[in-house]
């Protein structure tokens, strides 16, 4: 009486938005009088989460900044003592994503010198690649995360729904 059959509506047409390529570096500074400690942040546009590159960026992010034994943390916080904190993460999205690297300076260290240190470590990783041991650690970590995410019924349901919705798999 109150709830009848609801007829199926027309299929939803999803729009695909294409953004113009970023062809130049964009620098911006923002200051908040309530914040006493500056942060240096570098952000890059990345490909869709549906690409292999998105998974590679997740591994690179973990290698560079996950934990106190990561490359950037050891270099900038422990060895050179130019930063209080350094981190990186890949924020993958359905169309485009962002790869973000940030650091909090120690003392009067400039943003430019922090970015220089970060860039040097990225170039070092590109030219020398990573050791077999570090690669094995990364593989173990990601495999462990995958298994852990499927250890509960809730985790399995979330993964099935996500993979079906985003990847059609």
Language-model regions: role of each:
Residues 31, 57-65, 123, 135, ...:
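Short secondary-structure transition/capping segments
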Residues 7, 64-68, 119-127:
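Short amphipathic alpha-helical signal-transduction/dimerization elements
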Residues 68-69, 81:
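Short Ser/Thr-interspersed hydrophobic loop/turn segments at strand-loop and sheet-helix junctions
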Residues 5-12, 69, 147-152:
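Secretory-pathway/luminal and periplasmic proteins that interact with or process carbohydrate-rich
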Residues 1-48:
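An aromatic/glycine/proline-enriched structural segment found at the starts
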Residues 1, 37-48, 74-169:
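M16 family metallopeptidases and their MPP-like homologs
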Residues 42, 52-64, 71-74:
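Active/ligand-binding-proximal structured segments within catalytic/core domains
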């Amino acid at each position: 009486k109150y709830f009848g059959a609801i007829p199926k509506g027309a299929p939803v047409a999803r729009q695909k938005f294409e953004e113009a390529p970023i062809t130049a570096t964009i620098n911006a500074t923002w200051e908040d009088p309530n914040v006493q400690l500056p942060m240096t942040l570098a952000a890059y546009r990345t490909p869709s989460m549906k690409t292999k590159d998105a998974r590679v960026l997740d591994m690179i992010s973990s290698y560079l900044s996950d934990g106190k034994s990561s490359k950037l943390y050891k270099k900038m916080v422990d060895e050179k003592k130019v930063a209080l904190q350094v981190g990186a993460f890949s924020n993958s999205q359905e169309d485009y994503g962002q790869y973000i690297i940030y650091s909090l300076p120690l003392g009067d260290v400039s943003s430019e010198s922090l970015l220089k240190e970060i860039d040097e470590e990225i170039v070092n990783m590109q030219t020398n690649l990573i050791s077999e041991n570090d690669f094995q650690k990364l593989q173990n970590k990601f495999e462990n995360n995958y298994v852990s995410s499927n250890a509960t019924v809730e985790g399995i349901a979330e993964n099935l729904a996500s993979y079906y919705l985003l990847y059609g798999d």
